């Protein structure tokens, strides 16, 4: 599904083309082997039906159709991903051990903090703001480097929820690094290897549309991003 009103599928993921939080849910659904529809909306011109069911006015939403044509709307990517993990068959994305599972959830929250810094990085319009955010991101990935003890994924051979959370973060840098060398991962070889492994995962590759890179570059241009000035 592309744009407009969501259809009557059992699961519909209400999306925006660039949103990393939407990508999280799309990756988890794909890893579980769950069929779902996607409905893309323009966040600058949100339709009335979206306002009616989205308390925070944000994507993603997961519309869950129940018996009798009753539809529940789940919001917040973390909630959606946990719901999918708990209700859908397929490979488990969380560890079975409670302590290990809690540790994974901690690094998921850390990934969300990286996304917050990444927003400031990509929208920085001057050299000082850009460099401050660049250093902050490099430092956070340095923390991640220290906990990566297995390969190719966060927990070794098994793709986990943590991988689904970090894959959209790394996708940003696939575009950024095609514009200019950010050097964010210069001191983190294990993170670089993890990033490469996630890039080749089908669920990750298919979580966005083919024009993702063009859309992100257009967004950077609209924001007068300093990253583009470096490239120039």
Residue ranges and their predicted role:
Residues 75, 133, 185-186, 204, ...:
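Catalytic cores of transferase enzymes with a strong primary signal for eukaryotic protein kinases
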Residues 1-146, 152, 223-227, 231-232:
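GST-like domain detector, emphasizing the conserved glutathione-binding G-site
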Residues 85-89, 112, 149, 174, ...:
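Hydrophobic/aromatic-lined pockets within catalytic cores
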Residues 19, 163, 201:
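Conserved G/P- and acidic residue-centered "switch" motifs that form tight phosphate/ATP-binding loops
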Residues 107-108, 140-141, 187-203:
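Short, mixed-charge aromatic SLiMs
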Residues 154-179, 184-193, 197-198, 208:
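GST superfamily/GST-like fold recognition
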Residues 107-110, 121, 167, 210-214:
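Short acidic/histidine-centered micro-motifs embedded in hydrophobic/aromatic stretches
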Residues 194-232:
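Long hydrophobic alpha-helical segments typical of transmembrane helices together
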């Amino acid at each position: 599904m592309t744009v407009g009103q969501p259809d009557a599928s059992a699961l519909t993921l209400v999306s925006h083309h660039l949103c990393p939080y939407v990508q999280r849910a799309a990756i988890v659904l794909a890893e579980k082997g769950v069929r779902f529809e996607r409905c893309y909306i323009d966040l600058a011109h949100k339709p009335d039906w979206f306002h009616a069911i989205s308390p925070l006015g944000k994507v993603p939403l997961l519309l869950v159709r129940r018996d009798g044509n009753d539809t529940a709307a789940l919001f917040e990517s973390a909630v959606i991903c946990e719901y999918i993990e708990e209700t859908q068959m397929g490979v488990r994305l969380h560890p079975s051990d409670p302590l290990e599972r809690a540790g994974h959830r901690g690094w998921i929250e850390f990934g969300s903090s990286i996304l917050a810094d990444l927003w400031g990085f990509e929208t920085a319009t001057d050299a000082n703001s850009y460099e401050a955010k660049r250093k902050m991101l490099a430092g956070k990935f340095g923390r991640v480097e220290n906990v990566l003890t297995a390969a190719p994924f966060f927990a070794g051979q098994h793709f986990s929820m943590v991988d689904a959370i970090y894959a959209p973060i790394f996708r940003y840098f696939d575009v950024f690094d095609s514009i200019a060398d950010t050097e964010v991962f210069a001191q983190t070889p294990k993170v670089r290897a993890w990033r490469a492994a996630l890039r080749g995962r089908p669920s990750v590759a298919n979580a966005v549309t083919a024009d993702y890179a063009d859309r992100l570059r257009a967004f950077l241009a609209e924001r007068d991003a300093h990253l583009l000035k470096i490239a120039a």
